[in-house]
């Protein structure tokens, strides 16, 4: 599998509702941060606790990859739209956020190093 295929496979694993909670614990660098729509950061364990507690993830899928760029042999930036249907503290959400992610190759293994999620519904036509 090529590096690009490996990273896309990781993204699809992240989008699996059954694996989403533990995904970062299993696949992130030790200094990983997820920046929530509020702008507040959370680490891998914090994300796992949040998704396991307040969020009931019904559906998630990588809708479209807008940009995939090797910044070096060990760094990749990927910007994608995530279709996400979930309930947060009893409130249903059907979101289409844009997500920026940075992957880092550590000891020859690709790990997620950074992820930032936008709010609400992205206008996919603006990416064309």
What are these regions (language model features)?
Residues 4-6, 20-74, 80, 93-95:
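A solvent-exposed, acidic/Ser-Thr-rich amphipathic alpha-helical stretch
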Residues 6-17:
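Solvent-exposed, amphipathic alpha-helical segments
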Residues 44, 85, 111-114:
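C-terminal and inter-domain tail/linker signature
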Residues 68-76, 103-110:
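A short, structured loop/turn motif at beta-sheet edges
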Residues 79-86:
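Generic short beta-strand segments
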Residues 88-90:
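Outer-membrane beta-barrel domain signature
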Residues 96-126:
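Short beta-strand edge/turn micro-motifs at domain boundaries
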């Amino acid at each position: 599998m090529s590096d690009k295929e490996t990273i896309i496979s990781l993204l699809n694993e992240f989008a699996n509702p059954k694996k989403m909670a533990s995904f970062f614990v299993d696949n992130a660098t030790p200094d990983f941060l997820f920046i929530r729509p509020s702008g507040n950061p959370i680490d891998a364990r914090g994300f796992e606790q949040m998704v396991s507690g307040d969020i009931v993830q019904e559906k998630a899928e990588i809708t479209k990859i807008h940009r995939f760029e090797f910044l070096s042999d060990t760094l990749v930036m990927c910007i994608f739209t995530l279709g996400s249907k979930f309930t947060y503290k009893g409130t249903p959400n059907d979101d289409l956020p844009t997500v920026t992610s940075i992957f880092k190759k550590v000891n020859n293994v690709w790990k997620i190093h950074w992820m930032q999620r936008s709010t609400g519904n992205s206008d996919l036509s603006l990416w064309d």
